[in-house]
């Protein structure tokens, strides 16, 4: 059977369910899928949630994360939806960016209100730059007192506000269980609540800026010389687009240099332009083989700058995940793998933190021995002797 062609007719948006472990994230994911299947059967497959694809995912950094992926469409948009069933999986996914979210549905049980993990998830969403959160107040069928539901709603709005999210976001009162089971009391009412939730997601979560519209950036993977023509750098374009005869900067490791791209090739075919996702060779005017190296980036002039000192948020692998067997302390000197290269860095733990244990989710300062083209949100792996021992992202550039 031929694979269906991916129709790019509707805007594509990545969302996810976040929140405390027993508050009904996975049930809500199932309910959304079922309600949309019934409303738009042509574009939404019927999922068997016992078989939902929750295969472990190897993040690029060599960490196993259990993520369930489903896709569905509303009238306006095509969604990819991630649900991380386990709390540790959620933390790892957020920090590694294995499944990035353009917005999130925070699921809070009206029976419990916000719990410790609810708070941790909201904080993490803020730290990793999830732009918008809206709320599904779940299990409303189990609370008779409307005032109690309103108190919980107020508490959730306060929590969002404290973490820099919009306290006036949509909050939908729902029962995922009631919408999922045809024989549940008030079934139609709860089905409507899921439709209301998705209408709110359509309107409230912004369509992401496509990678093509961002400034051009290509990490250099390899450098070689073509006799009589000059130096070619190869790599996969991370974002943006680039036309022939455009000036670019080479950033990182050494002082920044400016040059012009005189030819663009992919798999030995010349192109007028390349864009995000292309595997490309760029011919650079006036630079020798020894002037550029793996680990630098080719970028639109002025769009990215080299830095050596940053604050990072890191998930430290456990022994079972192939990580360290023992804690580390300030002045630990592992390698930090950014895009295509390792750079040694010195870790300084925050005041009052004596050590970091395998399995911890930690924030600390790093000073690299060489500058790297860096911006907030950039992900990296922490490696020791070629093995990944942690995975993180830059939360703040310091120098």
Swiss-Prot record:
Disulphide bridges: none
Region described as G5: 175-177
UniProt-listed Pfam families: GTP_EFTU, GTP_EFTU_D2, GTP_EFTU_D3
Annotated CDD domains: EF_Tu, EFTU_II, EFTU_III
Residues the record lists as binding GTP: 19-26, 83-87, 138-141
Broadest EC class assigned to this enzyme: hydrolase
GO molecular function, one term: GTPase activity
Segments forming domain tr-type G: 10-209
Stretches for region G1: 19-26
Gene3D superfamilies: P-loop containing nucleotide triphosphate hydrolases, Translation factors
GO cellular component: cytosol
Family annotation (PROSITE patterns): G_TR_1, G_TR_2
Compartments where located: Cytoplasm
Record EC number: 3.6.5.3
Reaction catalysis annotation: GTP + H2O = GDP + phosphate + H(+)
InterPro entries, alphabetized: EF-Tu_GTP-bd, EF-Tu_GTPase, EFTu-like_2, EFTU_2, G_TR_CS, P-loop_NTPase, Small_GTP-bd, T_Tr_GTP-bd_dom
Subunit (UniProt): Monomer.
Function: GTP hydrolase that promotes the GTP-dependent binding of aminoacyl-tRNA to the A-site of ribosomes during protein biosynthesis.
Family membership: Belongs to the TRAFAC class translation factor GTPase superfamily. Classic translation factor GTPase family. EF-Tu/EF-1A subfamily.
Protein name: Elongation factor Tu
